[in-house]
Amino acid sequence: MSDIQIAQANEATEMKSITAIAEQIGLQATDIEQYGPYKAKLNFQAINRLKEKEDGKLVLVTSINPTPAGEGKSTVTVGLGDALRQLDQSAVIALREPSLGPVMGMKGGATGGGYAQVVPMADINLHFTGDMHALTATVNTLAALIDNHLQQGNVLNIDPRRIIWKRALDINDRALRQVVIGLGGPVQGMPRQDGFDITVASELMAILCLATDITDLKNRISKIVIGYNYDREPVTVGDLEVTGAIAMLLKDALKPNMVQTLEHTPALVHGGPFANIAHGCNSILATQTALKLGDIAITEAGFGADLGAEKFLDIKVPQLGKTPDTIVIVATIRALKYNGGVALADLTTENLDALKAGFSNLAKHIANMQRYGVPVVVSVNEFTSDTAAEVQLLQDLCQAMKVTAVPTSVWANGGQGGIELAKAVLAALQQPKAFKPLYDPQADIKSKLTTVVTEIYGGRDVVFEGKAINQLKQIEKNGWAHLPVCIAKTQYSLSDDPKALGAPSDFTIHVRELIPKLGAGFIVAMTGAVLTMPGLPKKPAALNMDVTADGQISGLF
């Protein structure tokens, strides 16, 4: 059966009411705002009350660089939570919510897979509780207010050529990357060049995921740089005097969403910035709440450990105020063979030499996570084509790095297939940790970028090209150089070349643009050819989707 068929078969008979799920973790009906029988948001009264409780342990799930062969990071995250509860551990999962763009594009659903899913699967993947739509409307409201300011006299002297705030849609639409607006004469607005980002790449998504309450949300929104005036001085949302209106539109989206897994493990699914073009972590409020509601909180970071995990550890952790107690790296034998040079069509054939060669990618991610001083466990997400010899070789290679590699079959077997992984994680949680940040935020921008490139990616250096050269000077002039860096980079390689698999070295990262995100609290460095508005593939996942006369969805994944 497909993922959606498995989800639908179980949803019809097995789902508990969301109030029952809330009761499992000590919440009352008055603590949640229901969106039907199986979805809810936690209200701020409950969140504030929970602040008095001690934090549980934090487990971060990440992976090797993604490949067409698939890794199953979200699936393992869900399955690990289910497995821990089977071992009588109080576990709560904290995930990102899916973006409609990838759902309809290349990826399909984003709620785990097989018998390790969060449900209601179709609802979560499509419109869920409306957070993405609220964000999209808010991004575009701000854009409209900026253009209205230009039209109504431009008191702030904003230079239309230097507006950096873009509109947004939660879909993949390459035709909207560059647009011209305001055509048609004086009453139609000020003509200027504009563009669209996908909603999850917008700074407002990052802010939603980093804000700790409405006051913090408003403070961050007020700092957003929307562009520059004719004297090349920054203009902020606060200068426009619309902070309150923008925050108002996000007041409900700020509340974490609660659902359940197929095995009734509570799951907080909230926020969804991409890790290749944003910081790639779910909301701080969801993670903090999971830490209060369970003895163990399991969360994930997007794409490979070079992107999502690095940003989790260097951007989110300082603001979360909690470091991971264990890091799980998800890998598959198929993906490692792909990194070792095997073609997609041949990945089901045993190939120990290719596995050993492709292990270089996993080895680099293991070393990187160990660099932060946190215990590491490897989850080997099983496929039927894996051979005993391949599994043994991978375990031996990991053991040589003093890391336990555990075969995991949660897609096929749910929590039961993650019991050994859960035991390994529980053992790792008992190990000492000595968290070490990667860099000093007070260092200059180039030093911080160079540290990430040399220490995490394995490269040689960083060069600034095109607009980035003057933007670096502007950032330094405006006193923003103390902010952490968020590198926008291809997810498919440790380098900025998506075709450089394994563990490339001695390469240069090319920074073409530096974008200050003062509300989020970091500087985005655009590298390579990465885009903030994706396009659809030749055969988008949407081609396989349908809905029956009675509302039954098919083909979602």
UniProtKB/Swiss-Prot annotation:
<dbReference type="GO" id="GO:0004329">
    <property type="term" value="F:formate-tetrahydrofolate ligase activity"/>
</dbReference>
<dbReference type="InterPro" id="IPR027417">
    <property type="entry name" value="P-loop_NTPase"/>
</dbReference>
<comment type="similarity">
    <text>Belongs to the formate--tetrahydrofolate ligase family.</text>
</comment>
<comment type="pathway">
    <text>One-carbon metabolism; tetrahydrofolate interconversion.</text>
</comment>
<keyword id="KW-0436">Ligase</keyword>
<protein>
    <recommendedName>
        <fullName>Formate--tetrahydrofolate ligase</fullName>
        <ecNumber>6.3.4.3</ecNumber>
    </recommendedName>
</protein>
<keyword id="KW-0554">One-carbon metabolism</keyword>
<feature type="binding site">
    <location>
        <begin position="67"/>
        <end position="74"/>
    </location>
    <ligand>
        <name>ATP</name>
    </ligand>
</feature>
<dbReference type="GO" id="GO:0005524">
    <property type="term" value="F:ATP binding"/>
</dbReference>
<dbReference type="Pfam" id="PF01268">
    <property type="entry name" value="FTHFS"/>
</dbReference>
<keyword id="KW-0547">Nucleotide-binding</keyword>
<dbReference type="GO" id="GO:0035999">
    <property type="term" value="P:tetrahydrofolate interconversion"/>
</dbReference>
<keyword id="KW-0067">ATP-binding</keyword>
<dbReference type="InterPro" id="IPR000559">
    <property type="entry name" value="Formate_THF_ligase"/>
</dbReference>
<dbReference type="InterPro" id="IPR020628">
    <property type="entry name" value="Formate_THF_ligase_CS"/>
</dbReference>
